[in-house]
Amino acid sequence: PDSHYIEIVENFKALKSVWNAEGKEVKGKELNEREISSVIQMLGRYDVLFEATTIDMGLQSDDAIGRHKEAQAQNITENLTSAHHPSLVEESTQLQFKLRQLSNQLYIQFVLGVALLGKALQDATLYYVQRRPAELGCFRWVIDAKDKTTTGYEVLWLNMIRPILMSQSFEQPLNMLKGADYSSFQKFQGVLPKVPEFLMGVVNERTPYEYTDITKLLRDLEFRNSEEEPGIQLVDILCN
């Protein structure tokens, strides 16, 4: 939670000092069980929510992954017609091509990353509205960067994460707790008199049409190097 982030970082620095790692990047694989436990205990004093998505690669095959990737690529242009602006058609076609070019390993990472962000968004809103509703007024997404400069994969992920989650939200809107205080979250919600024409047939007809603005929710999203981001280091430790 933002309200405790600075305090959490300071406590993490104190732990690193005990480990003789002050000012250094700490990797989870470098810590022993006792040191990892101390991180978990420290985070346990705050309303920290930990999410993970996993896959058993032993149950997957290259053919199955390839078919899944191709199906996702086809979905990008499935609903495009001559009525759409040529620039949108061109952009969508380029995204489709780049997705198909991903290796199966990167594609799996792509899918898990999308699933994780969507799951974190749903669970975090329900979790914090019951504990710290003011936290729902700001969302900052920081992702571990692969290199010092943004990679082609990361650019593709950034270009696709918003439309993918937006499409998912049409069919599965965020679950919201009845009677809870969502006043801080109102800035991310919108209301239209009816379902927009471009969504006719995609979502169920309802008046008024209430929706969550995924673009606003993901506005503050960036890839950062783990060396300069304590939060990413903490996630790496928890994942080990």
Q: Would you name each region that the model predicts?
A:
Residues D2-N240:
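Phosphate-ester processing/binding pockets and catalytic centers
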